[in-house]
Amino acid sequence: MAVQEGDDDPFEEQRERVDDSMQRLFRRYGSENAFEYAVAIVASVLARLLDLVPPVMLGVAIDAIFTDSRAFGLGPVPAEWLPATQEGQFALTVAIIAGSFALGAVFHWLRNWGWNASSQNITHDVRVDAYNQMQRLGMDFFSDKQTGELMSILSNDVNQLERFLNDGLNSASRLIVMVIGVSLVLFTYNWQLALVALVPVPLIALFTYGFISIIRPKYKTMRATVGALNSRLENNLGGIQVIKSSNTERYEDDRVDDASMEYFDANWDAIWTRIKFFPSLQAISGFGFALTFVVGGYWVFAGAPGPLTGELTLGTFVVFIQLSQQLTWPMAQFGQVINMYQRAEASSARVFGLMDEHGALADDDELPDLAVEGGRVEYDDVTFGYDEEPIVEGVSFTVEPGETAALVGPTGAGKSTVLKLLLRMYDVDEGEIRIDGQDVRDVSLRSLRQSIGYVGQDTFLFYGTVRENIAYGTFIADDEEIVEAAKAAEAHEFIRDLPEGYDTMVGERGVKLSGGQRQRISIARAVLKDPEILVLDEATSDVDTETEMLIQRSLDELTEDRTTFAIAHRLSTIKDAERIVVLEDGRIVEHGGHDELLENGGLYAHLWGVQAGEIDELPEEFIERAAKRQARTEAGND
């Protein structure tokens, strides 16, 4: 889908709430870099003032030494302090010019240090703050956002801020100081010719105002399209195995081409606007310089033209010509500064749009830590849904310390959601979840998740070594503890056979390992964590029978004397659970032990019959309900 101006921006609602995001950026982060800004600003002023010294001294030398049209003087410096001979005056002029260059180099260095240091500090803080805020958002936020779009904000948009905070502010400071300094010098020498030299200023202001109003929505669209392109690229790289196995490379080529072309069009639209704007500024600035040259030159050789009065010496004329050139450069660069500002403003709005996202789970550091005494877990009339659509409703059951509770039911029954509520991936809409009598919302999120180990069906390994992945979340573990955890997870043997053993790189998301190997590393991670409560979400769903046997053996050891929740489609793996909770359409329809549920002849017995191959003995009502659930699932995926 093409991204139009103002449309399809995932953070549009937050962007509209951002009130002058650039001012907000400086209010929030500027004070922390006050020293760097002070150095940069003072150094910028002094460096630019020193840049005015050579042309001024050249004008003095021409009038006093070469044309002898006025006495040699340096403003407030007493005449008796100055050399009386032309040779001495010339030597002093050279010394002052050389000194201004040397001292100016020092201040230019300090200026660059100040702007670079402040920009790096701020962009680092912005990126980290935005990431920290994103980490604290509930899983419903990530369900609605694309990874590539979020990466674009944390990378591209923050980098755009860095360019303005460094190059943009640096150029802006030089521009402001130069325009003010040059104007003061010119008016001091000859206010009439100074007015002529400043003729381009109102024209440039008018052109710039028009440029801002035109370019702002274009940059907004461009930032949205680059986010969409990054999302497409990230999605395709993550699914490269599916693309290759489906022989859909050409199809994905076309989709990336479409997304890239949308970005190309939006970017070129902004570029074309800049292309038309910048030459106009240069032409106006050049016109101002030419006008100053013509009027001043005529004044020197033929006297004051038209309504102008007074005398203009050759030295003063040379000062005007040189300073007019210094005035022309910042005028031409003014458009570049405005361009960088507009880019940064669009990016800062997206960054603060992310920071302003609602839905962060409350995690007050002052909340007490969870105190797990035995691991008794109670679900008390729990209801939760997305967008007012209930996923689980009125769920109530209790798991005693050391028990294993299995959650079973058809696809979409709400099993995984029930366990995610325990981990506070989401917060309940109604009811309570208690661990040893403590509401999970009344304890710190850190201590809650530290007390719960999670092994899911979609095992995620980070890019790094096997050792680092086992120790993830328990970073203080030593090598001996890591090896013992791997042995308990039936992983030590295959790890030892890897090329570098525990120091073998697993590749992006663990692609160098098989599914069963990744799962056993995940189990080793849970063993090392040694949690009081364990959550197993389809931990053996995608492995072969032999691997399942090994994993199940390690899980049996891990769950011993530990409160455990397990979800499994293969009912044979959970038939020994002390408590089996059967869900359908987000509600508990029955619960009990395996034998008891089979005798009841309810949904659990029917699901067991399906896996036992007893299809012909299933009631027609069960088959009809299954068909309706499948139809709803397919409709929801469309």
Model segments located where?
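An intracellular "coupling" helix at the cytosolic face of ABC transporter transmembrane type-1 domains
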Residues: 27, 31-34, 139, 158-165, ...
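Short cytosolic helices in intracellular loops of multi-pass membrane proteins
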Residues: 121-140, 146-155, 220-262, 328-335, ...
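Helix-loop-helix
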Residues: 66, 185-198, 280-349
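Transmembrane helix-loop-helix hairpins at lipid-water interfaces of multipass membrane proteins
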Residues: 2, 37-107, 188, 192, ...
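C-terminal portion of ABC ATPase nucleotide-binding domains
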Residues: 3, 8-12, 243, 575-638
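ABC ATPase nucleotide-binding domain helical subdomain, centered on the C-loop/LSGGQ "ABC signature"
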Residues: 128, 357, 430-434, 442, ...
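ABC transporter TMD-NBD coupling linker
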Residues: 327-388, 427-434, 441, 477-488, ...
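Transmembrane helices of ABC transporter permease
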Residues: 32, 39-46, 167, 171-222, ...
